[in-house]
Amino acid sequence: MFQSEWGGRLTSIFYNTRRVALVDNENMANIVKAIPEGFEGATPYLSIKGAADAIEFYKKAFGATETMRMAGPDGRIGHAEIKIGKANIMLADEHPEISFLSPRTLGGSPVTIHIYVEDIDALAAQAEAAGAKVMRAVADQFYGDRTGQFEDPFGHVWHFATHKEDVSHEEMQKRAAAAGGQS
């Protein structure tokens, strides 16, 4: 348990939904959530060489919606946000001077972004038509999802899925063994 500055107990420092008063000026106080709505879980923050082009690609390939963009004095995107379905994703142009490096500079990325979508088949066709590289073709999986994996032109890897079936842990282990996979 943690003590708040007001003496109340918090059950966790994470997912704290308490509201905090912030004063904008002498006459007005705003009440804000410590964790903004829609950002309760992990939010990927992508470093991209060519962030403006990437935003346009994500709109075309994945149906992304741009929710904000801030350019720096040098014209590079200092911060932007998009949504793919309900998933919030932050991104910015690569800034080597602060060690914010893109997959292209690093020679790839070990991170895969996983997002559930309503129709993986439609998204896959749209992504491929927009120029995404298919890394794993769309297929039904033993764990109940239909999935596909793609690399964007900027070096980020995306794993999209549509959940098709609830599978118990025991059944999942049986199916994995039958498929020759790990349990």
Language model regions located:
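Local alpha-helix boundary/kink/capping signal
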Residues: T17-R18, G50
